[in-house]
């Protein structure tokens, strides 16, 4: 359970990194510099900082590929977990559960797992947490 939560947190972190806005290129920075006719030192420092972001673009590409691999593995793990839970919970064969899971979308599978683990955690909570 702990590993599943950690893996889910990593997937969410990589999703944020992969979907973030790409950094401005050096060519675009030169255009901005010409348009704004930098007179203020703070603006020059800001543009220097943006010029350093080109390295981040390469890193984003690396994390984007890594994110795709992790996401693929996480999806496979979620499919297996959903099948396992259905077999145990509903008392059906593994093939029937696999057919049900295959018919579900990824979003439905995630919601099914969150609902299952949410109920499980709700039952395990300490009694003094009641409000």
UniProtKB/Swiss-Prot annotation:
InterPro entries attached to this UniProt entry: Latarcin_precursor (IPR018802)
Pro-sequence residue ranges: 21-60
Tissues expressed in: Expressed by the venom gland.
Domain of life: Eukaryota
Keywords: Antibiotic, Antimicrobial, Cytolysis, Hemolysis, Secreted, Signal, Toxin
Primary role: Insecticidal, cytolytic and antimicrobial peptide. Forms voltage-dependent, ion-permeable channels in membranes. At high concentration causes cell membrane lysis.
Family: Belongs to the cationic peptide 06 (cytoinsectotoxin) family.
Record protein name field: M-zodatoxin-Lt8m
Source organism of this protein record: Lachesana tarabaevi (Spider)
Gene: cit 1-13
């Amino acid at each position: 359970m702990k590993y599943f939560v950690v893996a889910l947190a990593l997937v969410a972190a990589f999703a944020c990194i992969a979907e973030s806005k790409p950094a401005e290129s050096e060519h675009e920075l030169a255009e901005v510099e010409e348009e704004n006719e930098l007179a203020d030192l703070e603006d020059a420092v800001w543009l220097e900082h943006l010029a350093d972001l080109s390295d981040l673009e390469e890193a984003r590409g690396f994390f984007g590929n890594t994110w795709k691999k992790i996401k693929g593995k996480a999806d496979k793990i979620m499919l297996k977990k959903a099948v396992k839970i259905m077999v145990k919970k509903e008392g059906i064969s593994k093939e029937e559960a696999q057919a049900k899971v295959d018919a579900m979308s990824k979003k439905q599978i995630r919601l099914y797992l969150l609902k299952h683990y949410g109920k499980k955690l709700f039952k395990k909570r300490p009694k003094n947490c009641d409000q």
